[in-house]
Each structure stands twice: as C-alpha cells, then as structure tokens.
C-alpha cells in the first residue's frame, strides 16, 4: 500500500443514503460518480465506504466510478459486520446489483466468521476489486457485539489479512471507549473515529490518541 497517495480522503456515507431522519436526502448515482471522479482528478486517492452506506449503493457506485482507474493508484477502505439483504425476498442469500440500485437493500448485523467473510466478498464484488487496503469492523458498539468482535469478527479479519484479501484491519466507530479496549487486547492497524476531536472538545479522546500513538495505530 502506498501511504503517500494523498493527505485527504473522500467518504461515501452520503452516496445513496438518507441521513438525519430524512433531513438530508443523500446523493444520487450520477452526482456520486461525478464527485468521485472530480476528487480523483483533484488528487484525492483515498476512498472510504461501507455496505451500510446507501445499503450497498455507495460501494456499487464507487466500483462503477473507479473501474477504469489503475488499482494501485488508489486506497480503498470498506467495512464489515453487516450483510445487505433483499427486503423483497428474505430467502435471497445475495442481493443483486439491480435490486440494490432500486433501493431494496436492508442491512443486517452478522459478526460470525462466515458473515464477516461474506460481507467482504460481497463488498469486493460491488467495488470491482480483489482486495481492500483497509477493512474496518463497523459499529460493534451499536449492535452490542463486543464479545462477538473478539470471538469471531477480528479473528476472521486477521485471517483475511494473512491471505492478502485485506492489507490493514481495524474498526470504524463513533465513540472512543470500545476502541481503547480493543487496542489493549488485540493488534489493530487503523481506527476510524467518527466522534468529535477539536481544540475545545478533546478530553475523552486524549487517552485514545495517546494509546494509538503508543500502539502505532493510525487514526
């Protein structure tokens, strides 16, 4: 992985998503692809997404936008812990791209070893790539899944890192308390923290940042 790709990255949470209880309607496919292409042409080479974002649409649109770009020139991050299932047919084990585009995707937590691997395999297919630069475990605090994270999710992520399917592993969360516990027990490469860290509000995050520096975990 080339760590000198860019200092800034583009997040894909708004692509196909309805946020803030419907206050923000998200970004459609045409605009999302335009944004991704503009970001790349402007020098941004780090792209972040997740199955949750747009219930599969964010990954799908990233894959379409970046399909003609040399893979080694970009850094792709996605997340695991949720599978996207078809609201119209609960028996479908894999939802089609067509139904994702139509908005029929529904996220379901699954921290089992099989669920984590399937999540990654489905993300790779949507993103049109054979590896991820970074794989983050998504929202174990929201699902009350801390024990499952230790028992099955992180071990499977580590195995995929050994296999070369992912280059770095970590977690993506809103608060710093659980990542602090994670770092004290397991080896992580990166953490995406969506909470606030400013000059005025950093008391809770100070311990977190110190541990990251000590453990050489990128934030």
Predicted feature descriptions by range:
Residues 1-86:
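N-terminal binding-site loop/beta-alpha segment at the start of enzyme catalytic domains
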Residues 5-9, 45-46, 73-77, 131-136, ...:
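Structural preference for beta-strand elements that scaffold enzyme active sites
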Residues 13-15, 50-52, 79-83, 137-142, ...:
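Active-site beta-loop-alpha junctions enriched in small/polar residues
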Residues 16-30, 101-117, 144-146:
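Active-site mouth loops of central-metabolism enzymes
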Residues 23-24, 87-99:
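Short, flexible, mixed-charge acidic loops at enzyme active sites
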Residues 25-39, 109-126, 174-181:
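Short, acidic/polar
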Residues 122-144:
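Active-site groove signature of glycoside hydrolases
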Residues 140-219:
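Beta/alpha (TIM)-barrel catalytic core signal, keyed to glycine-rich beta->alpha loops juxtaposed to Asp/Glu
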């Amino acid at each position: 992985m080339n760590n000198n790709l860019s200092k800034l990255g583009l997040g894909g949470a708004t692509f196909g998503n309805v946020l803030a209880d419907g206050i923000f309607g998200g970004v459609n496919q045409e605009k999302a692809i335009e944004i991704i292409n503009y970001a790349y042409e402007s020098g941004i080479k780090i792209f972040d997404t997740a199955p949750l974002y747009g219930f599969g649409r964010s990954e799908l649109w990233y894959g379409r936008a970046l399909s003609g770009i040399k893979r080694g020139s970009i850094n792709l991050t996605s997340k695991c812990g949720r599978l996207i299932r078809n609201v119209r047919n609960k028996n479908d084990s894999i939802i089609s791209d067509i139904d994702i585009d139509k908005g029929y995707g529904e996220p379901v937590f699954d921290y089992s070893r099989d669920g984590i691997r399937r999540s990654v395999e489905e993300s790779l297919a949507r993103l049109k790539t054979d590896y991820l630069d970074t794989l983050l475990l998504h929202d174990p605090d929201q699902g009350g899944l801390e024990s499952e994270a230790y028992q099955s999710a992180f071990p499977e992520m580590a195995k995929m890192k050994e296999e070369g399917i992912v280059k770095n592993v970590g977690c993506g969360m809103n608060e710093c308390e659980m990542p602090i516990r994670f770092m004290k027990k397991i080896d992580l490469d990166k953490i995406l923290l969506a909470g606030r860290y400013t000059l005025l509000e950093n008391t809770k995050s100070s311990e977190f940042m110190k541990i990251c520096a000590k453990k050489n975990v990128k934030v």
